[in-house]
UniProtKB/Swiss-Prot annotation:
CDD domains (alphabetical): SMP_Mdm12
Name of this protein: Mitochondrial distribution and morphology protein 12
Keyword terms, alphabetized: Endoplasmic reticulum, Lipid transport, Lipid-binding, Membrane, Mitochondrion, Mitochondrion outer membrane, Transport
Subunit structure: Component of the ER-mitochondria encounter structure (ERMES) or MDM complex, composed of MMM1, MDM10, MDM12 and MDM34. A MMM1 homodimer associates with one molecule of MDM12 on each side in a pairwise head-to-tail manner, and the SMP-LTD domains of MMM1 and MDM12 generate a continuous hydrophobic tunnel for phospholipid trafficking.
Amino acid sequence: MSIDIDWERATSGPDGELLAERIRSFIHDKFQQMVLPRFIRSVQVTSFNFGTIPPELEIRDLTDPFPDFYEDGDEDLSVSSEEQSPMREQADRYRERIDSWQTNSPGSLEGQMSGRMGFGHPLQLAPDEDGSRLHPLRSPINLGDINPYLFPRSGTPGIPGGTSNLGYFMPLSGLSGSQVPLRAVTRGNPFSGGWPDSPLENEKRIGHGQGPPRRRSEVDVDAIQSRPSTANTGNTLLSRGSVSTGDPRHSHPSQTLLANNPGQVPDANDSPVSAVPPLSGTPPRRMREQKAEDFQVFCRTKYAGNISLSLTAEILLDYPMPSFVGLPLKLNITGLTFDAVAVLAYIRRRIHFCFLSPEDADALIGPETGAGGGDTMEPNSLRRKNLSLLRKIRVESEIGRKENGKQALKNVGKVEKFVLEQVRRIFEEEFVYPSFWTFLV
């Protein structure tokens, strides 16, 4: 089914001019972030115009929106209370559980001592005895971490208080063989390498240093995200990533201690941290609730119009010396040919818009058919995968000043090639799925 668009009404007037200015400013900002070649000093986008020729639109399918469109980002802070989804409530309960666990568990040395001694106020410790500043001593020999409290002042007959300073000063040569039993070194005693930090320090790190772990979907998934391939996905696109519930970074402190000490038997009088049940995995992504009125349209979009984009730059000449002189450049894009599948999803006062890559479009709505009914190109061919959505771009370039009605230089191929490659890259990175734009209506 074809759709007729009142192109003049949509692109003219104050609203059309404002939209054109926003597009010009957006492309200009992207060029400012690029690394320019050595022979180009700067690029400025001066104007943008929609032209007078409208695109051709043909509706190909009507489906449910992509799951990614339901993801609730950090910028959606004005969502009403009725749009709170069950998955968001589950994530909120998860964070409340972490906060409650950190509040009730003794996370510092002061909290433990004040709780055991029964004082109403926490015990004030000297700076040298502060739990946050107390670190295990390190030996030059790889004996692991040695806690100074393991070596109190030993008693000497006839001298009250003893004379040993081993608890305060560690000899540079480490411990002698008579002081470190061989069995202790081989069985993972605190003197051996790889001995974990004390449970007290682990609790302090958890209570004050780390806080609740960040969601996997916000950090790990986005860091390794690449455009999903949908060659064999049927009618749905691949999800952006999965959350692993067995991530060792999110394991419980008590489980980590027991794992490092297989022979240790948990004591009933241990810290309440060991009695807290492990948290069940990581919270899911924030997703808005799906409703029956949500819909998504696949639309074949063809355009061969006179859209225009004007850019100015300065080209540097290296003769007779590097960057000897700069020539002004004016580059005009006077039209382009475009063919792609657009996705338009409506979800409760939000419109999500993007284009599909050629292979994604073939997987979802089938390959494009020609006038004779056959496929215009093999769906999985290498040529189609490398085909850009911007099929053809018409460019006019003027370099140098006019002298006697003639240009000093014309149509420098390197400059045109660079600008066209950057225009294609901006379009594909910003408008092709999984990238999409959201508009509030």
